[in-house]
Amino acid sequence: VQSALLRMQYAIENLNGPCVVPGMTGTGKSALIRYFAAEYPRLRPFVHIVFPALSADELTRMILAELLTDTDVAVPASREAVFREIRSALRRHTLQGRRPLLFFDDAHQLSDEALLQTVLPLLTLAESDPNIQLSVILAGQPILLPRIRRFGELSERVTAASPLHGFTAAETSEYVQQCLQLAGAERPLFSDDALTALHDVSGGIPRRINRIGDMALLVGFAEQRTIIAAEQIESLAGELLPNAA
């Protein structure tokens, strides 16, 4: 996650084209979205595209609607007019000291049409106009990167590919301890063997760690255990993640 974060920061701060963030479900893409929204107040407007499975025209119009500061301005009907308004809106934000960020969540769901008729023209527009500062992040399942590489014009503009992988065993242990401290725990609640088991059964994927760890604490509380052991983790993993075993 740290490596992906650093690459994304570099791409954004240097306006080096779009950053592609491929990763399995639960590897932390949503956490990165929250981080950039909170830590980079200059990245405004922060346009978070949650449902990208739209036609190119629908997606382009949605982006314009998010960029417009005057809610009374109507989104034009023609595609050419929509892109003219997008250019004007991006110039206006840049002139006022802001840097818009387009964050495409689940970007693997973007159609080829949307990639070539919405995303690519937006990148070309930003490249060709010195009065526009625009950052673009495409986050999605691992299939996203090979899809983008199919299109030369789009692929050559990608300056950072930041795959999200699961935590290492040490990172899993550190993550769990930090979560417990934030929750007010004053002593370890998982044995070392339990932390190792938690990493093994979760693959280091944060969402799985949270799911199994939370249930282990709940069951441990009900059974009045003072510490969670590896056996409890393995038993719960079989119930909660039968396909991951």
Per-range role (PLM):
Residues 26, 73, 101, 181-245:
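C-terminal alpha-helical "lid" subdomain
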Residues 35-39, 142-159:
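Short regulatory helix/loop adjacent to the ATP-binding pocket of P-loop NTPases
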